[in-house]
Regions:
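N-terminal pro-sequences and low-complexity stem/linker regions of secreted or lumenal proteins
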Residues: 2-8, 13-408
Length: 408
């Protein structure tokens, strides 16, 4: 789920400001001429040469709460073992086609405890018994998601891509931006500007790589990036819907772009999936109609933050005590993507960071963040646990470069 960061715009009433506990790394901050704050990760970037890539802009589009099997597992083009298995069932309930596009109006359980019960030690047989009942086994088809399915012949579909943590939204968004949730396993959000360990914007700023977050139909400070020190009220992270379309037309999208959308545009159940899909079609068409796409400079990474309590049959690997999480869709769109390809290389949300770091010649967050326990204890509390190292330092997940037909 997506959550506005300011108290006045928080969508989930149960979210409250809470201080992040344990394992923090102070990040020095300065203020630039525009009033935006800038991070300093120390000498790690000094003397690093910017590499040259055919990609100049990476757009990260992350929606809400849909697992892979539930969303695209019915596609007949998937290789054996990656789509919904014939005869698969949970507690006697087999996957079934939803008769509507609101998932029967249900938002299945998907917190830390619920997701671990659903994964059931890697058997993936606990989605129904977890308390979600029959609705956890519903899926969609190409008829329900015509735009997304129309992209498949023109994109790489990552069929072995997992979210970051076996839990709900906040920790997974944190992995997407920082490689680690800092030990957080629930949706109780820290206060804006309170996180002091590095996230990807710090690396980008220090390397002179441009970036922006666009709040599409969303209020200011809506992005989880605003949780980090110096990012709250940063104009780079608070660009508007109108600015997005203007930048697409002008060919001025920065090097790294994030797109944030509120409900019902984020596809979070039980909102109609067609609403979010329609907005994605508009946003992607604007990018693809711009001069940067025409020059072959752009890649769009479209994924989902977590599985939302919906079934999937492929077990995640134990990268550390927190994840990976449940398998989710990931589409890689680019003039240089391997069109019509289904990639089966193991990846998770940390892979997005690895691609950004690779393309722009950045160090990993794992290499500059020395605060978190490298041993990663094999237990974690429901709300907080021992902080785990940034996932972009793991050799167990890909950097997504295999999704492109040329070296990037």
């Amino acid at each position: 789920m997506a959550i506005g960061r300011d108290a006045a715009t928080t969508r989930r009433a149960f979210l409250r400001a809470a201080a992040l506990v344990g394992g923090t790394l102070a990040v020095a901050r300065t203020t630039d001429a525009a009033g935006a704050t800038a991070g300093a990760t120390g000498p790690a970037l000094l003397g690093r040469a910017r590499r040259t890539s055919v990609l100049k802009t990476i757009v990260v589009s992350c929606q809400e709460n849909h697992s892979f099997d539930h969303f695209v597992g019915s596609d007949a083009r998937l290789p054996a073992g990656y789509g919904i298995p014939r005869g698969w069932q949970n507690s006697g309930v087999r996957p079934f086609h939803f008769s509507n596009r609101t998932g029967d109006g249900v938002d299945p359980n998907h917190d830390w405890v619920s997701t671990h019960r659903a994964v059931a030690g890697g058997t993936m047989r606990g989605f129904v018994a977890n308390g979600n009942g029959r609705d956890a086994m519903g899926y969609y088809t190409a008829a329900d998601l015509p735009y997304y399915y129309s992209l498949l012949p023109h994109a790489t579909l990552c069929a072995e891509y997992f979210c970051g943590v076996l839990t709900e939204t906040l920790p997974n968004r944190m992995v997407l931006y920082a490689g680690t949730s800092g030990g957080i396993t629930d949706d109780v959000a820290p206060a804006n500007g309170s996180l002091t360990w590095p996230c990807i914007t710090h690396l980008l700023h220090d390397a002179g790589v441009t970036y922006a977050n666009y709040n599409v139909h969303a209020p200011a400070n809506y992005s989880y990036l605003c949780l980090w020190k110096g990012n709250h009220n940063d104009p780079r992270l608070n660009r508007t819907t109108a600015r997005f379309f203007a930048d697409c037309r002008a060919g001025t999208l920065p090097n790294v772009v994030w797109i944030e959308r509120p409900s019902p545009f984020d596809e979070h159940p039980p909102a109609s999936i067609r609403i979010g899909e329609a907005l994605s079609a508009q946003l992607f068409a604007a990018i693809q109609g711009g001069p940067q796409w025409a020059r072959g400079e752009v890649a769009i990474l479209h994924t989902y933050d977590e599985g939302g309590g919906y079934f999937d049959h492929r077990p995640p690997r134990a990268i550390d005590a927190f994840g990976s999480g449940v398998r989710v869709p990931m589409l890689v769109l680019s003039p240089h993507a391997r069109h019509g390809h289904v990639d089966t290389t193991y990846s998770d949300h940390g892979s997005v960071l690895k691609l950004i770091e690779h393309v722009f010649g950045l160090p990993t967050l794992a290499s500059v963040n020395h605060a978190f326990d490298r041993s990663t204890p094999r237990s974690a509390g429901q709300g907080r646990g021992a902080a785990f190292p940034p996932r972009d330092g793991s050799a167990k997940i890909s950097d997504l470069t295999q999704c492109f037909s040329v070296a990037v």
